[in-house]
Amino acid sequence: MLHTPIGRLRTMGFIEGMSLLILLFIAMPLKYWAGLPLAVTIVGSVHGGLFILYLLVLAYATFSVKWPLKWSAAGFIAAFVPFGNFLYDRGLRNYK
């Protein structure tokens, strides 16, 4: 899966999506229910870095595959919609 630009994009999308799940369902409850705001600081920073990396991998895939602009635009929009990258991944799986 990591041998193609689309495979790398799908993998990065999954990792970035999982970091959002960890942020929402583990770090946020730790902050508000257990009084540990550092959890959100750490996980939020990691998620932000992964988000930027996802956008870089999207740009790499766009120029490597030379696919239509709609795929790049959809990936960019999906990056800003919570859990949108999981829906985008379904489309990428069918794109191959």
UniProtKB/Swiss-Prot annotation:
<keyword id="KW-0812">Transmembrane</keyword>
<dbReference type="InterPro" id="IPR023845">
    <property type="entry name" value="DUF3817_TM"/>
</dbReference>
<dbReference type="GO" id="GO:0005886">
    <property type="term" value="C:plasma membrane"/>
</dbReference>
<protein>
    <recommendedName>
        <fullName>Uncharacterized membrane protein YdzA</fullName>
    </recommendedName>
</protein>
<feature type="transmembrane region" description="Helical">
    <location>
        <begin position="67"/>
        <end position="87"/>
    </location>
</feature>
<feature type="transmembrane region" description="Helical">
    <location>
        <begin position="14"/>
        <end position="34"/>
    </location>
</feature>
<dbReference type="Pfam" id="PF12823">
    <property type="entry name" value="DUF3817"/>
</dbReference>
<keyword id="KW-1133">Transmembrane helix</keyword>
<keyword id="KW-1003">Cell membrane</keyword>
<feature type="transmembrane region" description="Helical">
    <location>
        <begin position="38"/>
        <end position="58"/>
    </location>
</feature>
<keyword id="KW-0472">Membrane</keyword>
